[in-house]
Amino acid sequence: MAHSHSGSVNYFESANKVIYEGKESTNPLAFKYYNSQEVIGGKTMKEHLRFSIAYWHTFTADGTDIFGAATMQRPWDHYKGMDLARARVDAAFELFEKLDAPFFAFHDRDIAPEGSTLKETNQNLDLIVDMIKDYMRTSGVKLLWNTANMFTNPRFVHGAATSCNADVFAYAAAQVKKGLETAKELGAENYVFWGGREGYETLLNTDLKFELDNMARFMHMAVDYAKEIGYTGQFLIEPKPKEPTTHQYDTDAATTIAFLKQYGLDNHFKLNLEANHATLAGHTFEHELRMARVHGLLGSVDANQGDPLLGWDTDEFPTDLYSATLAMYEILKNGGLGSGGLNFDAKVRRSSFEPDDLLYAHVAGMDTFARGLKAARKLIEDRVFEDVIQHRYRSFTEGIGLEIAEGRADFKTLEQYALNNQPIKNESGRQERLKAILNQYILQV
């Protein structure tokens, strides 16, 4: 049997608890910028950032890729089956404690293996959920969100809620039903829907409208069941444009918002936005965050980064200060993420295979967003962008512009104005100047 919650397990024995040592520190296992109790704008860094560790990349990923076998050296991997599942829970809560991480997130199949039947699978899940619940009680770590893996098993080859097979739709419903019960039991602050295989490869064999209708039916059923059992966490939907299907239905923030509004789901769902998925969609991360924010639908963040030179989801740990600063700017302008957080949906590189690399990676990501938070806060305090934007759009605060903004103008009055107007004069957007100022703020904090 694997160890249970006994306190005797020590999978990361070479590392002490990671503490804040300041930017002069040369200790790779110390925070240089993330000082959890430092107060910024009335909230601690811990409250602003709400860091979460992703169970799948951190404790189940083994480094396998399409060109090669597993590389990861994990001291718990000699266990099998349910013993392995238990050992991973021990390892997880040890790492949470060493990083002082307040939250974690998981797919159902990350934490417990599938059995030969759905009933057996659910029994496996119940055993591990009980163990996690014990650890949560004693550690104070909370569940940011859980979700259902409806993409790995071959039954989902044609999708889950968008499958052409009604038996698969029914199985997926049973799986999410269990997921919502798990969310309630563990006090998950959110529940995520990522349409792993909800999309298509070719329109030649696809009834696109029927699949979208079915996906909406599925989500309405989930909303109804959450109400029935009294689960009050925030529902989140996560956009991604492609991979594993050619065309994912929840392509990006704008597409997903249109879907939610079309099917009357926008009062029940917000968006869980991932940086790498924005890259795949041809957007900056801050574009996706802004799009969700202006629609009042920014819910949570999967903090990672992609490689713009590659056309697939690389899920690297976030170390780009520029992107992190602009992301935190959007989050602060949103008044925070509410029940959401910054979940490190990120994996160490295949060649970073030692257990300590998990610590180095999370320290890097946490420091990056701490620095981004401080720079973004200063930018907002100094109204760097706000004053520029206010000045740039000032023509809409008086005269004909004010008439337009207040809805008092029409095509006829605007034509009359245009006919009598002197030559139009535009002003420079001063983009380069703004980028230089942004760099200055990032470098100074």
Swiss-Prot record:
Alphabetical list of SUPFAM superfamilies matching this protein: Xylose isomerase-like
Gene Ontology molecular-function annotations: magnesium ion binding; xylose isomerase activity
Cofactor, how bound (note): Binds 2 magnesium ions per subunit.
Upper classification of the organism: Bacteria, Bacillati, Bacillota, Bacilli, Bacillales
Entry keyword annotation includes Magnesium: yes
Entry protein name: Xylose isomerase
Self-association state and partner proteins as the record states: Homotetramer.
Binding site residues for Mg(2+) 2: 274, 277, 313, 315
Any one cellular-component term (Gene Ontology): cytoplasm
Family: Belongs to the xylose isomerase family.
Cofactor: Mg(2+)
List of catalytic residues: 107, 110
Compartments, as annotated in UniProt: Cytoplasm
Pfam entry (one): AP_endonuc_2
